[in-house]
């Protein structure tokens, strides 16, 4: 299982820095998209599926929190979402958590916090995938039984 990751930040050096501290392939991840702001990320998400979004909180055009709220409200993506922030203000973290943010990571982002996030997402995704497989199996059994009777 490979985790499809999108990185969203208006600072190119941050995007580059996020892709360097770990070997994404080794942790079974693939960076499928980098976006310079929430609006660009939103447009990508309307047409493409990702498993994890790491987004800066403060960006022009659309902030990370606005992106998170919009994709949840419009049911565009159920990807796991982590906010990257230079602010340790509780109100930002509270708003992010209210919108189903899986993690609120303070900048500068450490290698350890990225690896911990990836492990967390991998475990959650495995459980979700298993639940989905069980649901589909039960659906098939139900259909077969009803067709046979």
Model-derived regions, located:
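Short amphipathic alpha-helix used as the core "switch/output" element in two-component signaling
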Residues: 43, 65-76
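Two-component/phosphorelay signaling modules centered on CheY-like receiver
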Residues: 12-33
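A short, hydrophobic beta-strand element within the central beta-sheet of small alpha/beta folds
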Residues: 78-87
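Receiver (REC) domain active-site loop signature in two-component systems and cognate sites
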Residues: 59
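Interdomain helical linkers/hinges and coiled-coil/dimerization scaffolds
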Residues: 97, 101-149
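Active-site residues of response regulator receiver
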Residues: 9, 56
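Acidic catalytic/metal-coordinating carboxylates
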Residues: 37-40, 63-66, 85
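Acidic, metal-coordinating helix/loop segments flanking the phosphotransfer/catalytic sites
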Residues: 34-52
